[in-house]
């Protein structure tokens, strides 16, 4: 992928796709750079057991940007590694990319046992909204964790959104001249991501971190209707297996009580429709992350989706 090296062509295709699709130019540009780093990771995965996961993986799987998720989340397997080997593997998954320069703003980065966040800068060609409250453009954040359970994973075909929405003629040029197109990357399975998000929503809800809760509420509401998730729900053994991976992971998370917590005791599943603070943060989240009117999910709809989920979870053995 070298489209970004031809600044005129890069800006031109961003503008053309923006005009045809309505997707914001700054999002098309950042998504390209997110995908650039993922392409580099995909080339390492034969030797490096680091797997793409989370909200960005969810929407990359859908080849859409229903809710813009701008960071790269990775789970890094360190089974049978010494402490030194584990640290080096985590660093390789987060700190060693060559496609973009590491940031000089070290306050954006974090390095602790079992978790590293590295940040890579890019120079935006499109106009940046200086009023963007999250200030999320001009860099890509890569977060890798090794206390997580890195399974099950599967190869997933992904591509930059500007390729997804390009015309056939534009796609041919992107592939032939700039090596931009679909590729496969080992990714945590969507069924596992779904299970993770149920627990993540409860984790943040316990702590009244409602803006973070809101993102997971939205994602789970989207995923609940996916054919792949509906098939899992119909297969209780498989659903329990996915939930089990996450419960195992929670035994390794400091301060979490979710490894043994029954679904009947989940605060979130007790109902949140009358939580005014959560409703406010949910609406704020959508203003900042959901940019197409057709992708906006009313809070009351999300409440109903989670009521359906509650009934499903309470019937599990």
Identify the meaning behind each predicted range:
Residues 52-56:
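Glycine-rich beta-strand-to-loop/alpha-helix junction loops that act as flexible
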Residues 1-50, 62-66, 76-317:
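Structured mid-to-C-terminal alpha-helical surface segments
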């Amino acid at each position: 992928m070298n489209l970004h090296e031809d600044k005129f062509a890069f800006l031109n295709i961003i503008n053309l796709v923006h005009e045809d699709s309505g997707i914001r130019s700054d999002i098309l540009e950042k998504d390209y750079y997110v995908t650039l780093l993922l392409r580099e990771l995909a080339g390492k995965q034969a030797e490096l057991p680091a797997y793409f996961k989370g909200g960005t993986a969810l929407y990359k799987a859908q080849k859409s940007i229903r809710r813009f998720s701008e960071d790269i989340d990775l789970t890094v397997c360190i089974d049978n590694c010494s402490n030194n080997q584990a640290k080096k593997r985590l660093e390789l998954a987060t700190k060693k990319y060559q496609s973009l320069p590491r940031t000089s703003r070290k306050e954006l980065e974090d390095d602790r046992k079992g978790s590293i966040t590295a940040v890579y800068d890019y120079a935006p060609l499109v106009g940046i909204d200086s009023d963007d409250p999250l200030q999320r453009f001009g860099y890509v954040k890569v977060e890798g964790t090794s206390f997580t359970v890195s399974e099950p994973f599967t190869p997933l075909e992904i591509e930059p959104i500007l390729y997804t929405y390009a015309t056939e003629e534009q796609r041919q040029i992107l592939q032939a001249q700039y090596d931009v197109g679909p590729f496969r990357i080992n990714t945590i399975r969507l069924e596992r991501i779904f299970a993770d998000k149920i627990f993540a929503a409860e984790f943040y809800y316990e702590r009244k971190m409602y803006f973070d809760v809101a993102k997971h509420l939205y994602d789970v509401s989207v995923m609940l209707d996916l054919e792949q998730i509906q098939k899992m729900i119909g297969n209780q053994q498989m659903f329990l297996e996915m939930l089990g991976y996450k419960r195992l992971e929670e035994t390794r998370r400091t301060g979490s009580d979710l490894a043994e917590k029954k679904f009947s005791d989940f605060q979130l599943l007790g109902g949140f429709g009358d939580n005014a603070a959560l409703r406010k943060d949910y609406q704020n989240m959508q203003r900042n992350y959901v940019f197409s009117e057709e992708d906006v999910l009313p809070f009351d709809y999300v409440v109903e989706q989670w009521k359906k989920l509650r009934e499903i979870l309470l019937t599990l053995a």
